[in-house]
Amino acid sequence: MRIAIYPGSFDPVTYAHLDIARRATRIFDRVIMAVFDRPQKRLLFSTAERLQLLQAVTADLVNVEATSYEMLTVEFARQVGACAIVRGLRAGSDFEAEFQMAQVNQTIDPNIEVVVLMAGRQFAHISSTAVREMASLGRDPVEFTPPVVVAALREKFAQRG
């Protein structure tokens, strides 16, 4: 069985993330979308909230599961028996950071490949940052993220006042 992990902050998960996951299932038998628990990064949603949202929006996706992890990504990949780390690119500006991270991961474990999927044209403009920004300004980003995420954003920003 060919397993890949698709790691990310998913703060929040967007249609672009889900598109990459769906397309990755054409290449791999199982895709694990993994929420990276980064205490040092300032995030809108907690790890538990991000995981809950990710589980909700992937429930109907065949061969996709959601989990979280707290270690180096390549070590997590090794732990779950993954042969690859899937990354999505929206624009050329994403390439440099992804390339550097791929080099680090290949140095740590050359047996785990990094597979980069280009964002589909209809999703290339979507980012979690833009979704959070819209929601913070009172606009429901319904075109960019599933309804359960829109509801969670609405609730989160209502709590903040």
From Swiss-Prot:
Q: Which gene encodes it?
A: coaD
In which pathway is this protein known to take part?
Answer: Cofactor biosynthesis; coenzyme A biosynthesis; CoA from (R)-pantothenate: step 4/5
Residues the record annotates as the site (Transition state stabilizer) are H17
Enzyme Commission number(s): 2.7.7.3
Oligomeric state and interaction partners are given as: Homohexamer.
This protein's name:
Phosphopantetheine adenylyltransferase
Reaction catalyzed: (R)-4'-phosphopantetheine + ATP + H(+) = 3'-dephospho-CoA + diphosphate
Enumerate the GO terms in the molecular function aspect: ATP binding; pantetheine-phosphate adenylyltransferase activity
**Cysteines paired by S-S bonds:** none
